[in-house]
Structure formats: structure tokens, C-alpha cells
Amino acid sequence: MACPYMNGGDTLPHRVTFMEGGEECQQGVNKVEMGFGQTYPEYLQLDKILTAQKLKSEADGQRVDDEHLFIVIHQAHELWFKQIIFDLDIVRKLLNNTIVDETKTLKIVSGLDRIVKILSLLTEQITLLDTMSPLDFVDFRKYLTPASGFQSLQFRILENKLGVKQERRIKYNAQHYKNVFNDDDLKALNTTEDEKSLLTLIESWLERTPGLKSTSEDEGFWSKYESSVNKYLSDLAKQAEDPSNTEEIKKQLRAEYSKTSDAFQSILDPRQHEQHIRNGNRLLSHDATKGAMMIYFYRDMPRFSQPYQILTFLMDIDSLFTKWRYNHVLLVQRMLGAKQGTGGSSGYMYLRSTVSDRYKVFLDLFNLSTWLIPREYIPMLSPRMVKTLSEHSNLSHSQSSESE
């Protein structure tokens, strides 16, 4: 059999290769010589960025090489924090409307996606410091005092803009987190506390979920959901009392039914939900939680596909911040053990306390799985609601505006 690559002959066909020489690769102009605009170093102001790595150990005549890595990693973090804040402000601006333009939802999704990717990078980037030995860190640690990552203004601004509640913060040396900042920084922090956080904006957005409430034309999602839950619980109770079950199995199934029923009652009863908010166990309002659940159940509908992505990215942001905090805790324990932090905190013990649900902004979204029901119990959408969720509310308006 002839080789399929030989064209029936003994020689290989002509191969396409990249030109490594010749006139084609030299056909261009040197715009720098012609004085066109700024050069790469000028545009990026590299003279400022690349000269900002001042090793304190070197200035003291005892240069420690790993101090350079330590500085670069933290400077890179601050640059990425700035980008996250920039993108977060764009997302917040798009959400900060009585009616969110649904044709802009993709821009919100893209902004959150970018934030997630940056946080993924930072989660891995901090582990680069693991290439530094604890003994090498000790050699230049004395030059850091009283500097501490706790003093990162951008990180605190980012937390506030996301929606970290002040009352949920772990105190730093039994003091308010703002006590380490000067007057100008305090003004910036106070501004972010007064602004609407991403959590607040998402809550308002979810409360307006289409089809959530009953109207004269449609029963609404929530009343149908309550009926479905009651049927689901009734079936669970019947399963527990099945005559074919042994008494031991019946006892176990009854206990499971009781726990499941209590869990559903905590969301079906608005008063119980409000009590959970007062206790600090939940953050989103009852209506916002109902809206999120509706999006979860009907995420395949065109109008809910991007909102579902938004909710997913919000949980990703929380997850990645938790992972970053955890990686930071492990790093500090490895480098310091039980020593006090350079800023005066308890070091590892303080940081470990921040790796908790207290710092999860969108904790309620994680807990939605508690109240999901099997697919066969999910309420059917009415024909009217199918139509509502198949077309963006302001799509027709946008198209008519463009035609004008």
C-alpha cells in the first residue's frame, strides 16, 4: 500500500514552514525612530515599577536575596487588587439601578469571570513564597516591623466593596480594623462603608426576579414551590412508614424526615428566616433568597442562564478568597510558627480565625442546596411564565431604539 503522504512518488509533498528569513519578515517600519507616541517602557512607566524593589537588607549592608521575591509578590498582589477593585466598581455600577438592563448582564458576567480568574492566579501566586525557607525569611524579617499585610488598604476596600459586614470581622488585637490606618486612608474606608456593596446590590437585584411573586395572570413561583415542598415532605413521611421497613430503619427515616422538615420550614416561614438574619446565620433577605432559588431551579431558561452564571461566580469569589486566606495561613505557620506577626498580631492564630464563614459574603448562596428538591417535584412553569423567561424584558426596547 502506498504511503498516503507520498503523492504516489518517493518524495514528501512540499511542507508549509514559517519563514525565518527573506524580505517578507523585514517589511515594516520602526515607529520609534519616526517619533510615534510612547514606547513600551514609557507607556507602562516601568522606570517607576521596576525601581520600586528596595531591599532593606541590602541598604543595611546584609543583602538577603529572598527579600526581593517577598517584595515582588506583595507588589504584584497590590496591582491585582487594584484591577479587581476596578472591575468590581464596573459591575456595581451596572447593578446599581432600579431596573438592571438585562442586555448588560453579559458585561456583569464577564467582569465577575475576570475577578475569579485573577483570584485564581493570586491563590497560586502566594504559594511562590513557599520556595523561600523559614531561615531565609528570618534573615530579613526584622526589616519588616511594623509593616503587616493587615495594613493593605486595597484589601480592606475590596472586602467592604464586596460586602464583608463590619460586625462579622474578627478584631485585630482586640481593636477595630480601621485603627491601623491614617486619616486619608480612613476617609477612603469610610466611603466604601457608606457605598452600596456588591452584596446589597445583588440582594436588590434578586428581590426583583421575574415571576417570583403572584400576579392576577400567574400564581407565582413561591406558592408553587411551597406546594411542591409539602408534597415532597409528605412522600418522605410515607417512605419512613413503609411496612416493609424494619423498626430500626423506620426510626432512622423518621429522624431524617424531621431534620429535613425543620430545614424547609426555616425558609418557608419568613419569620424564621428573619430570625436567622438577626442571629447572623443568613445575610440575604427572604425575597432575595427566593429569587436565587428560582434562578437555580430554572437556570435552563434563556432569561436565567446568565443570572445563574452570576450566582456561580459570586460563590467562586468567596471560595477563592477562602482558599487564599488558607494558603496565607499555612505560609505564615510555616514561616513563623507561633511567633507574633510583624504588625503585632498573634500571627498564625489571628489569621486562622479569619478562615471562616464569617468572611463569606455570599454564604446564603452556598446554603441554597439545603432547600433544593428533586427534579420531579420542581413546579412546572405556566405557558405565560415560559414566555416571560424566554425573552429579555428590555430586548424589544433596545431593538426599537436601534432602529430609530
From Swiss-Prot:
<keyword id="KW-0823">Tryptophan catabolism</keyword>
<feature type="binding site">
    <location>
        <position position="141"/>
    </location>
    <ligand>
        <name>substrate</name>
    </ligand>
</feature>
<dbReference type="InterPro" id="IPR004981">
    <property type="entry name" value="Trp_2_3_dOase"/>
</dbReference>
<dbReference type="GO" id="GO:0020037">
    <property type="term" value="F:heme binding"/>
</dbReference>
<comment type="pathway">
    <text>Amino-acid degradation; L-tryptophan degradation via kynurenine pathway; L-kynurenine from L-tryptophan: step 1/2.</text>
</comment>
<dbReference type="GO" id="GO:0019442">
    <property type="term" value="P:L-tryptophan catabolic process to acetyl-CoA"/>
</dbReference>
<keyword id="KW-0560">Oxidoreductase</keyword>
<comment type="subunit">
    <text>Homotetramer. Dimer of dimers.</text>
</comment>
<dbReference type="GO" id="GO:0019441">
    <property type="term" value="P:L-tryptophan catabolic process to kynurenine"/>
</dbReference>
<dbReference type="InterPro" id="IPR037217">
    <property type="entry name" value="Trp/Indoleamine_2_3_dOase-like"/>
</dbReference>
<keyword id="KW-0408">Iron</keyword>
<feature type="binding site">
    <location>
        <begin position="70"/>
        <end position="74"/>
    </location>
    <ligand>
        <name>substrate</name>
    </ligand>
</feature>
<comment type="function">
    <text>Heme-dependent dioxygenase that catalyzes the oxidative cleavage of the L-tryptophan (L-Trp) pyrrole ring and converts L-tryptophan to N-formyl-L-kynurenine. Catalyzes the oxidative cleavage of the indole moiety. Involved in regulation of protein homeostasis, longevity and reproducive life span. Specifically regulates proteotoxicity due to age-related aggregation of proteins like alpha-synuclein, via its effects on tryptophan metabolism.</text>
</comment>
<feature type="binding site" description="axial binding residue">
    <location>
        <position position="328"/>
    </location>
    <ligand>
        <name>heme</name>
    </ligand>
</feature>
<keyword id="KW-0223">Dioxygenase</keyword>
<dbReference type="Pfam" id="PF03301">
    <property type="entry name" value="Trp_dioxygenase"/>
</dbReference>
<keyword id="KW-0479">Metal-binding</keyword>
<dbReference type="GO" id="GO:0004833">
    <property type="term" value="F:tryptophan 2,3-dioxygenase activity"/>
</dbReference>
<feature type="binding site">
    <location>
        <position position="342"/>
    </location>
    <ligand>
        <name>substrate</name>
    </ligand>
</feature>
<comment type="similarity">
    <text>Belongs to the tryptophan 2,3-dioxygenase family.</text>
</comment>
<protein>
    <recommendedName>
        <fullName>Tryptophan 2,3-dioxygenase</fullName>
        <ecNumber>1.13.11.11</ecNumber>
    </recommendedName>
</protein>
<dbReference type="GO" id="GO:0046872">
    <property type="term" value="F:metal ion binding"/>
</dbReference>
<keyword id="KW-0349">Heme</keyword>
